[in-house]
Amino acid sequence: MTAESNLKNAAEALSESEEISVLTAGISMRPMLREHKDIAVIRRKSGRLKRNDVPLYSRPGSEKFILHRILKVTPNGYVIRGDNLFKKEYDIKAENIVGVLRAFYRGGRYIDCEKSRGYKLYVFLNRASYPARYFWRGLIRPTLGKIKRLIIRKNY
């Protein structure tokens, strides 16, 4: 079973069950969720979600389901981004959301997203460090790569 079909099946399972567990896939939520190693516990969506919740949703016109963090709640929907990404998705509608991350198993350890102090600290630090990570990966690192390539070309 592919990771994509795993989440699609999860969305179908949530219509029948209150809570499900799925193996994670992809790198957009690293370092919190590791690809093919961690298990996400997702519960059916009930009511309006809040900032820092991690919904299971699909983009309009797509059958692909994704887990990303809510950055902002707007009157039109949600602004969402993966922890390991820089591009935000705007106006994700409530009808596109089928579930929300309740907890996850990391290395066999159960981490509750509502009660764990370590998880809440991770969310705070991840959000606070975003400008520095964006600056490093978006500007400094590519510039250093170009300088390195220029130096290598001149030496050969």
Indicate residue ranges for each PLM-predicted region.
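Short, low-complexity, intrinsically disordered N-terminal peptides in bacterial proteins
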Residues: 1-5, 153-156
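Feature for secretory/organellar precursors and membrane-associated catalytic proteins
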Residues: 2-86
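Acidic/glycine-rich C-terminal interaction modules and beta/coil loop segments
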Residues: 58, 62-156
